Amino acid sequence: MQMGPDRLQTAIHHRDLFMPLSFHKMDANGDDCVVVDARNSANPVTSALARRMGDRNRGIGFNQLAVVLDCEDADARLMFWNTDGSPLDVCGSATRGAADRLMRESNSKSITLRTHRGLLTCRRTSNGNISVSMGPPLFGWSDVPLAQEMDTLVLPLDGDPAACSMGNPHCTYFVDDVTAIDIAAIGPTLETHPLFPLRTNVHFVQVIDRKHIRLRIWERWGGIPLGSGSCSCGTAVNGIRRGLLDDTVEVECDGGRVTVRWDGVGAVFLIGPVEAVFSGTVADSLLKD
C-alpha cells in the first residue's frame, strides 16, 4: 500500500522531529569538548540544553560544546557554548574536534567551517593532527575589549601583562616559573578585573626558549583546564609581539602540546592532536526543559 503525499510529508516531519541529537566526546590534550551534530535534528541546542549537557554528574560533561549546523557557504557552521550555557565566539579545541569528525565523515583532508570569527580552514596534517586557521588576532583596546583606551602590549597591571583577542579576550603574564603561581588563588580576581568588562582568559607563561613555552591557564568561566586552543594562540601571539618568541612556537600545557604559528600579520594557525573518546545520542531527559 502506497502512502499518499500528505501522509508521507507528515511521516517525514515526525521522523525529523524525533531524530535524536548525536554527539562525540573529544579529547584535545585534556581539553575535553563535545561535538553535537544538529544538522538532521529538530531539537535546537539552547543555552539551557548546553548547561544540562555540560553537567559532569548528570549530563555528558565538557569544557566547551561545538554544535554543527548546515551552512550555505561552508562545509558546516559551528556554534560554541560554555559549560554554564553561555555562548562563545571561538574555541580552538572544539573546532579541532568538529573538524576531525567532519573530515572523517566526508573522507576529506580539509574543510571550511563558518563561525562568528568568520571562515576557518581546517586541514589534517601528515601525522594526523588537525591544523586550524584561527583568523587574525585583534589588538585594539575595544576589540579585546578593555574598559578604556590603552596600549594592549603592556597593560597597567602588576606584572605588565599583554592583551589580545582571538574572538575571546586573553591576558598574558610572562613569569620566571609557572609552577610557582597559585593560579586558583589569583585567577578569579584577574578574570573579573574591572579592566575586562567581558571578563578574560588569564595565561601564565614561562619562556623555555624562543620556540617553546610552558603555559598554565585560568579560563574565563571555566577555571583551570588542562589545555586550551585559543589560549595557546593568544599566549603565543602576545609572546611574538613582545619579541620573546619566533613565529612558530610549541606550547606545552598540563594536558599536552600544540603548535602555534603566526607571521605577525595574518591568521594564526593552531596545530594539535584530537581524539574521539566515545559517541552517543543525547537522552530525552536532557532534551526536556
Locations of regions flagged by a protein language model:
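Active-site-proximal beta-strand elements of phosphoester/diester hydrolases
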Residues: 133, 161-165, 214
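Active-site glycine-rich loop that binds ribose-phosphate moieties when present
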Residues: 138-160
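Internal active-site segments that recognize and position negatively charged phosphoryl groups
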Residues: 153-180
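A glycine-rich beta-to-alpha transition motif near the start of alpha/beta enzyme domains, typified by
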Residues: 11-127, 172-289
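Short, solvent-exposed secondary-structure boundary/capping segments
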Residues: 128-135
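Short, charged beta-turn/beta-strand-edge "cap" motif at the junction between a beta-strand
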Residues: 136-137, 257
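Generic structural detector for well-ordered beta-strands
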Residues: 123, 133, 145, 156, ...
